[in-house]
């Protein structure tokens, strides 16, 4: 499973499910599909028994414009507002109750999670999965992820 490598629990924004992170700054190498498979096979787990799951959702953040971009390039790893987490898609109701581990909700109780269908339905991505017109986005060659 290669889910939630970064999220509202992290200190900075980052790819939810990076395929690779070997070329990310060393402090931002939190794990990836490549490093997970390498670790399991190094531990002698049979490679033909590994099934890799990747999510079809993403996290949203409130990031100040001043740190969101450098020139015209989106910053992948940047600080975000941990209190004002955006509401996610229509399946993301805010909560004020602790999670199953007893941890209080982060920030304002929103998770900021968008399922893939909502990224298209809410206009972040086009029907073909590319960044929608009027949105700023990039394909990160390191993590092999799209950042709308």
Language model region names:
Residues 1-106:
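Substrate-binding surface in catalytic domains of secreted glycosidases
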Residues 90-148:
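Hydrophobic, secondary-structure "cap" segments at the distal end of domains
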């Amino acid at each position: 499973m290669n889910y939630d490598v970064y999220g509202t629990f992290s200190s900075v924004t980052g790819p939810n499910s990076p395929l690779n992170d070997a070329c990310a700054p060393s402090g931002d190498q939190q794990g990836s599909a490549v490093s997970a498979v390498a670790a399991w096979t190094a531990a002698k787990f049979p490679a033909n028994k590994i099934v890799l799951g990747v999510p079809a959702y993403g996290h949203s953040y409130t990031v100040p414009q001043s740190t969101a971009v450098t020139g015209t390039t989106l910053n992948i790893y940047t600080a975000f507002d941990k209190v004002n987490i955006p509401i996610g898609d229509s399946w993301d109701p805010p909560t004020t109750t602790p999670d199953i581990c007893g941890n209080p909700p982060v920030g304002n109780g929103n998770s900021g999670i968008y399922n893939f269908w909502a990224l298209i339905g809410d206009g972040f991505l086009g029907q073909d999965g590319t960044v929608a017109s009027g949105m700023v986005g990039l394909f990160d060659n390191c993590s092999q992820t799209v950042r709308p």
